[in-house]
Amino acid sequence: LLEIEKGKRFLVEALFFVLLFAFIYWTMHYVFFMDGSDLHSGFTTFGDFSPHTAMIRSFSFHNNFPTQYPHYGGVDVKYHFMFQFYAGILEYLGMRIDIAFNLISAASLWAFLVMLYFFAKQLTGYISVGVISVIMFFCRSSFAGLDKLVQAVISGDWESFWSNVEFIGYTAH
């Protein structure tokens, strides 16, 4: 009987992790995606994607060795080298740049959240604490997202909840 309970718990955790990865990838794709030949990025992130996509393309289309920033000639690469190199290699091998970028980003965030889940679960002994820890990670140090969700449930106004394009809450952005 104990083995059956462990098997059920494993399936629930596995389903949680699969859904978590799907959610993370969906959020990544929502911010950075291709539509035909146009590359789209989120309103608050487009400035950050410019040097990253240039660096990725310097590996996928060119021979950027010794490695330098395309935007800042002569400057040694200080950070994100392996991420950009790996995304460049994936694009070189045929994967679209948005999928390569989002897949690595989603896998990295997912791996961190899996570790957070197991740390919280191991620390307290409760699966629910692990799940709550993962959910709270997305709350930006406030309950504004949960507050917005509760308001949508109470008012029944799901249209404004799903179509919201402005920052919510009381934290700085």
Each model region followed by its residue ranges:
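Active-site lumenal/periplasmic loops and adjacent helix-entry segments of GT-C-fold
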Residues: 20-173
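Membrane-proximal intrinsically disordered regions of secretory-pathway and membrane-system proteins
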Residues: 11-18
